[in-house]
Design a protein with these regions (language model features):
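C-terminal alpha-helical cap/extension of soluble enzyme domains
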Residues: 1, 171-263
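A general structural signal for well-ordered alpha-helical segments in protein cores
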Residues: 21, 25, 50, 133, ...
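Structural recognition of alpha->loop->beta junctions
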Residues: 58-64, 90-93, 114-123, 230-231
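Catalytic alpha/beta core domains of metabolic enzymes, predominantly
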Residues: 101-204, 208
Length: 263
């Protein structure tokens, strides 16, 4: 019902050295023991670099990849298409295309349409960087559309297959219930459940984000609050302070989650 995505931005993937990245992937695949699907986050390198990384990930047991365009090459649309075409031809596992605001490398709908001819491009992680949120769902019968913007309910209504979230690995019953409600078309209940957690958590993100950047800061706070700390952020990104952690524990407790005592 869920996928373990390793070394994407929330997992500090862009900050990992190559040997760390593949040690992490190897450990995750071994720990999963064929009980979960493992997807690795890759990006930013040129075509040759990405293909080398993708082949290694495939050999280590990843069943798919999340891949962003080579943003530092400032590629044009035809070059983005060629990048994914070359990658698709070089591997035998699935690729989820991903681009977000802030990368300054948008992918336009016509380029997504042309990707339909690429055998191993199987999913699009969608946050409507350009155009309207609904646009991508014209391709819902071609690709697995994965929401990347708190739009799980709308995604399901429009034919999407899943959503990115910050919480399924923190307290799985919450997001599994959200998606179950969506599949049963109990959309109002699903949205209310999402909002009951995302609303309070967004306030924590806002408070922490005013002091330090980085996508992993609150994520690491969440794991620590639930009794599974996974280490500090990588510099120069900071960590949650005690006041922020107290607020986070209060929020999670208010959501009814089993937060262990901090004493």
């Amino acid at each position: 019902k869920s996928v373990i995505k390793v070394a994407a931005a929330m997992g500090e993937g862009p900050m990992l050295r190559d040997h760390e990245l593949y040690a992490l992937l190897r450990t995750t695949v071994q720990a999963a023991d064929d009980k979960a699907a493992i997807v690795l986050g890759l990006g930013y390198k040129d075509t040759k670099g990405i293909i080398d990384d993708a082949k290694r990930a495939q050999d280590l047991g990843a069943i798919g990849l999340q891949v962003v365009p080579p943003i530092f090459n400032l590629p044009k649309q035809n070059e983005i298409l060629q990048f994914y075409s070359d990658l698709s031809d070089a591997i035998d596992i699935g690729v989820m295309v991903y681009v977000t605001k802030g990368m300054h490398t948008p992918i336009y709908m016509d380029t997504y349409r042309k990707m339909a001819d690429l055998e191993n491009i199987v999913a699009i992680k969608w946050g409507a960087v350009v155009g309207e949120y609904e646009d991508i769902y014209e391709l819902a019968d071609t690709f697995n559309i994965i929401d990347n913007g708190h739009g799980a309910v709308d995604c399901h209504k429009l034919g999407g297959k899943g959503y990115i979230n910050h919480t399924v690995d923190i307290h799985p019953p919450h997001d599994l219930r959200v998606w179950e409600l969506c599949k049963n078309k109990q959309y109002e209940e699903a949205q209310a459940l999402l909002d009951s957690v995302n609303g309070p958590l967004d306030k924590v993100y806002e408070k922490v984000g005013a002091r330090t950047g980085g996508q992993s800061v609150v994520k690491k706070g969440l794991t620590a609050a639930m009794g599974r700390p996974c280490g500090p952020s990588r510099p120069p990104t900071g960590n949650m302070n005690e006041e922020e952690m107290d607020l986070l524990r209060e929020v999670l407790t208010g959501c009814g989650w089993p937060v262990p005592s901090s004493n």
